[in-house]
Amino acid sequence: VKVFDDDINKLRIIQQVLGQGLFTSTFHPNVLHNAFRSADVVIGAMRYINTRHRYIIATDLVRTMKKGALVIDLRVSQGGCFETTCCLSREDPAVFEQYGVLHYCKLNISNRVARTTSMAYSNIFVPLLLSLGDAGSVQGMIK
């Protein structure tokens, strides 16, 4: 497993939580190229704050992947993480092959696994709500 992000602090936290054995890196072109070339599965889950600072995985990187490898775009409903998936519509098939690489791009994938999504949301929101309760108000929590 290799995790890429543009925020070094997030990458450090991921390593602290999951262990030093996990490979993390920023979006360095050479490192990405080597990772894509050897990957069996690539999952795109990048969240965009605004469209000016979008990072989209180029078609050239997808072309370097092994035949039969799989790309899963979890952000296709927000515009997609990959050039090869970003122009899909609801009528397009969820699974298709491009450049010998399988692509799974289903709008609202999290709706397909409602229980897992609910647990993930609980892991995010329960600590926030507990902190809010301890602080007494949103303003108190912000301070």
Question: What do the PLM-derived regions correspond to, one by one?
Answer:
Residues 1-44:
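Glycine-rich phosphate/diphosphate-binding loop of Rossmann-like nucleotide-binding domains
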Residues 7-10, 28-29, 47, 76-78, ...:
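Glycine-rich beta-alpha junction loops
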Residues 11-15, 40, 59, 63, ...:
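Predominant activation on well-ordered alpha-helical scaffold segments within soluble catalytic domains
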Residues 14, 36, 55, 83-85, ...:
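Short, well-ordered secondary-structure micro-motifs
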Residues 25-28, 37, 41-47, 67, ...:
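Metallocofactor- and cofactor-centric catalytic cores in central/energy metabolism, strongly enriched
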Residues 42-97, 102:
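ADP-ribose/adenylate-binding Rossmann-like module
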Residues 76, 80-143:
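Adenosine-phosphate binding glycine-rich loop
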